[in-house]
């Protein structure tokens, strides 16, 4: 009997509007009823409008067909397909060159996917470049380069975090390089540039430099400073003096002699090539060996050439930089990489700038860089979003030259679709209230982890005489449009052979809250319209954190009262006394869910313990958990939250 009922319960579906688990027939009836109500409302509205100006009657939204995302599609066609046609190399080499001055965010995940994916698809490699650069490969295709040219802002922890992020996403570096690997070579080329009379040492301050570039708004004539008239020997002497510590920070800098007077492109207005850092912090790798450091505009293009990067793929804010990139490479190096630019990924309703994130952290709005409400990669991971779900979202969006502005709702919907078929299901009660089944008998129930995928296996749960349901699933007074538990009303318990009927309840004399419900099995009644989740006695206590949008508006960075004025004071709700069934132990033991190459590290990572709490949401174990305490973060809700900004 129990097996038959369990099989029937496995076929229940979620009513998105009420959050109830119901039969397919019942859901069909509800949808039809809502459609009739919507049509009637539309007809009443239409009757009040002028003839010929009637809007179409509202119809229930059709359930979208499940899309199968081809991860290679964005490399075969569109922008990236065209990029390859421009330079169809047999051996493609790309790079991912972050500056190690902070933690990566969602936009960086797109850059990783683009560069590693492009090289992998074309059988090449990707390098990772850091302050230097690092060359990486997605499973041996890309280079990762660290652009480590600013020791004042760079820290060793950022290098480690960036490498960890790349591997978490499932990509393996073919090579890791650093801009600092090439410091001497770049210095020598800077001297060559001086000898070619294409660079000079300048002593102008910021105010004077701005005047040379046309003033604050660029409305005045541009001109080159007097230092550009210095001869080669003078410039070489000064540049070597910069190297040897003869100048104070910001008192001298090497400028490229480009075309400041005639070229309308600001990236050709005699950009800086070398500067003396203000704080003179020791470099992460080279210590105090160097007192001067190349700028991004000088180092980036040269390192691309040194490393044989065939396709230098970056975001559209570097479109104008392409001219200076090519100008410098043509002067100094033989191998010429090709730079092309694609649109950034922006998420509305949040911020990803380092300055904004620091403001939130310093004002204790969030717990740190890994707060689940942030869209840093650390925050996304702690929240429980799997690497595969993140990549699937990026592949779904594709790549164009336009900036991609995406709502939080769309992001969460993509994650929800990914999780639906890849994580097990458990029962969780946020606000438990006991139900004593007076005629109940204890028995073991075999519950599948997924009603749709038997490969996920099953677990045993003990049906006890006292069970706990969510307080929101009981009403003291019944109504016709209410289908959960109420006095004299019947409701199904997920995977339990018989529905229960509430016969009485008691209340706390002080608070007025429901203290206990008494019920009996309704063995002869009709099949219930609704099933609710429950947990037995002996279930595991848990703290559950439900996170909403961190900001009230879609553009928190532009809020009239500043960033902090736009913070949503209700962005986190904590349920301290939740209960989860003991099947959680098995889910934890078998993590990661789903299996992912980047999460098979041999170490336990709590956020890989992911599951769907039936009728509640998707959850992951938080890093605040201990052996004695379970802490859960909501990954995404089961249905779209209408109150969430889009």
Curated annotation (Swiss-Prot):
Catalytic activity of the protein: tRNA(Gln) + L-glutamine + ATP = L-glutaminyl-tRNA(Gln) + AMP + diphosphate
GO cellular component, one term: mitochondrion
Signal peptide coordinates: none
Highest taxon above the source species: Eukaryota
KW ATP-binding (keyword) present: yes
Protein name: Glutamine--tRNA ligase protein virJ
Similarity annotation: Belongs to the class-I aminoacyl-tRNA synthetase family.
Gene Ontology terms, MF aspect: ATP binding; glutamine-tRNA ligase activity; sequence-specific mRNA binding
The keyword Transcription regulation appears for this protein: no
Annotated Low complexity bias: 38-61
Sequence motif 'HIGH' region, residues: 98-108
Keywords: Aminoacyl-tRNA synthetase, ATP-binding, Ligase, Nucleotide-binding, Protein biosynthesis
Region (Disordered): 25-65
A Pfam family annotated for this UniProt entry: tRNA-synt_1c
GO BP terms in the entry: glutaminyl-tRNA aminoacylation
């Amino acid at each position: 009997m129990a097996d038959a009922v369990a099989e029937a319960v496995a076929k229940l579906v979620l009513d998105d509007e009420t959050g109830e688990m119901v039969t397919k027939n019942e859901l069909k009836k509800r949808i039809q009823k809502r459609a009739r109500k919507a049509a009637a409302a539309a007809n009443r509205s239409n009757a009040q409008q002028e003839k010929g100006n009637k809007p179409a009657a509202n119809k229930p939204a059709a359930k979208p067909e499940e899309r199968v995302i081809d991860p290679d599609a964005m490399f075969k066609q569109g922008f990236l397909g065209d990029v390859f046609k421009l330079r169809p190399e047999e051996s493609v080499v790309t790079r991912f060159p972050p500056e190690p001055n902070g933690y990566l965010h969602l936009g960086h995940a797109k850059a990783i996917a683009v560069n590693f994916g492009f090289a992998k698809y074309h059988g090449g490699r990707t390098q990772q470049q850091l302050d230097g650069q690092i060359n990486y490969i997605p499973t041996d295709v890309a280079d990762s380069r660290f652009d480590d040219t600013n020791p004042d802002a760079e820290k060793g922890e950022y290098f480690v975090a960036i490498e960890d992020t790349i591997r978490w996403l499932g990509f393996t570096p073919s090579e890791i390089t650093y801009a600092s690997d090439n410091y001497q070579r770049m210095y020598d080329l800077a001297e060559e540039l001086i000898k070619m009379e294409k660079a000079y040492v300048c002593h102008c301050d910021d105010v004077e430099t701005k005047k040379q570039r046309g003033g604050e708004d660029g409305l005045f004539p541009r001109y080159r400073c007097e230092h550009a008239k210095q001869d080669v020997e003078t410039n070489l002497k000064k540049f070597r003096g910069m190297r040897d510590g003869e100048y104070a920070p910001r008192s001298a800098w090497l400028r490229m002699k480009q075309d400041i007077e005639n070229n309308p492109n600001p990236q050709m207005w005699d950009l800086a090539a070398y500067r003396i850092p203000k704080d003179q912090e020791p470099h992460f790798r080279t210590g105090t060996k160097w007192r001067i450091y190349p700028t991004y505009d000088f180092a980036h293009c040269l390192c691309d050439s040194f490393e044989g990067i065939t396709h230098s793929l970056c975001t559209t804010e570097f479109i104008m930089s392409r001219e200076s990139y090519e100008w410098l490479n043509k002067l100094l190096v033989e191998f010429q990489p090709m730079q092309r630019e694609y649109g950034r990924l922006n998420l509305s309703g949040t911020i990803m700038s380092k300055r904004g994130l620091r403001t939130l952290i310093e004002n204790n709005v969030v717990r740190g860089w890994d707060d689940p409400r942030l869209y840093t990669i650390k925050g996304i991971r702690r929240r429980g979003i799997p690497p595969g779900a993140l990549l699937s979202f990026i592949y779904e969006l594709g790549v164009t030259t336009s900036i991609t502005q995406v709502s939080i709702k769309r992001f969460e919907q993509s994650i929800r679709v990914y999780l639906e078929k890849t994580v097990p299901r458990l029962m969780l009660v946020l606000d438990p209230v006991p139900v004593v089944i007076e005629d109940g008998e204890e028995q073991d129930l075999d519950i599948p982890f997924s009603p749709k995928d038997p490969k996920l296996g099953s677990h045993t749960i003990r049906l006890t005489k006292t069970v706990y349901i969510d307080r929101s699933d009981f009403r003291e007074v019944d109504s016709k449009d209410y289908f959960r538990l109420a006095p004299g009303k019947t409701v199904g318990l997920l995977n339990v052979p018989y529905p229960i009927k509430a016969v009485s309840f008691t209340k706390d004399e002080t608070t007025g809250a429901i203290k206990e419900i008494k019920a009996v099995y309704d063995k002869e009644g009709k099949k219930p319209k609704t099933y609710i989740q429950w947990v037995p006695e002996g279930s595991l206590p848990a703290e559950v954190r439900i996170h909403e949008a961190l900001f009230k508006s879609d553009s928190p960075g532009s809020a009239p009262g500043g960033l902090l004025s736009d913070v949503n004071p209700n962005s986190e709700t904590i349920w301290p006394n939740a209960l989860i069934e003991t099947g959680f132990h098995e889910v934890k033991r078998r993590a990661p869910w789903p299996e992912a190459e980047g999460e098979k590290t041999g170490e336990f990572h709590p956020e890989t313990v992911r599951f769907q709490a039936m009728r509640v949401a998707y959850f992951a174990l938080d890093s605040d958990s201990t052996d004695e305490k379970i802490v859960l973060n909501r990954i995404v809700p089961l249905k779209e939250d209408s109150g969430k900004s889009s």
